Amino acid sequence: MYRVYKNNKFILISIPRITNKLWQKNCNLVILLGVLLVLTLFHDPIIVAALGGESNPAVGLFTFGDSYFDGGNKMFNFFWPYGKSRDDPNGKFSDGRIVPDFIAEFMGIPEEIPPVFKTAVDVLRGASFGVADASILGYPATSMTLNQQVDNFRSMKSNWIDDFIGRSLFMIYIGTEDKLNFTKNKPNALLHSLKASKFAIQLLARWVAYQYRDKNTRQGNECYEPLNDLVKQHNEKIGPMLNDLAKTNPGRTSQH
């Protein structure tokens, strides 16, 4: 299913993993979405002109995330069938190209965005910081987190001027590993398998005493309300979740 959500600075776009058959079947739709992505996010004639295929060094593309946006940083997919549609196993989790490759083409970038962990690459027009199995929360420990990818970008920032960075597109796809690991690792389920059957889970308290202070000036006496918003969401959702667990696990009771 294809979906697009946007505001004045961010755009969320849902596109399935590109395969050779899918590309042949939905070529026009993917092209349309790619053009929409660039035109709706940027109202800049330089970028619009670049869509005509003209190489324009004023814009670049940077990608972060997991295997969907891994430009070849996880070095074990250099064999068939990866890259089979181009006869070019390039380390990407696809049969040839991934979504950022098509977006780069729409933006007039002549070469595919290179993986940063590959030596001697040209990052003039951007770079791929995404790594397969990456997660937000960092579990398992062997995976790279989004924060670590951003740190890598920070360490390389001197390669680009601020104006170029401001004009460039930053694409992020991450979260699959976090959801997968959450469904595989459930401490309560483990306790239940060890014969525990009665659970009391206390709701989170409102952070009335937490004071948000500027990290540089150490000033500020206002409560940081975004934390309380998260607490409220947590407390609203945990009850129905526990009820579902009780229904699917006979003999388990819980109170919250």
Curated annotation (Swiss-Prot):
The protein's enzyme class: hydrolase
Key words, A-Z: Glycoprotein, Hydrolase, Lipid degradation, Lipid metabolism, Secreted, Signal
An annotated GO cellular component: extracellular region
Protein name: GDSL esterase/lipase At1g18120
This protein's record includes keyword Lipid metabolism: yes
Similarity comment: family membership: Belongs to the 'GDSL' lipolytic enzyme family.
Active-site annotation: 67 (nucleophile)
EC number: 3.1.1.-
Signal peptide: 1-49
Native source species: Arabidopsis thaliana (Mouse-ear cress)
Tree of life domain: Eukaryota
GO biological process entries: lipid catabolic process
Subcellular location: Secreted
Entry keyword annotation includes Thylakoid: no
Gene3D superfamilies: SGNH hydrolase
Lineage, top ranks: Eukaryota, Viridiplantae, Streptophyta, Embryophyta, Tracheophyta
A GO molecular-function annotation: hydrolase activity, acting on ester bonds
Pfam families: Lipase_GDSL
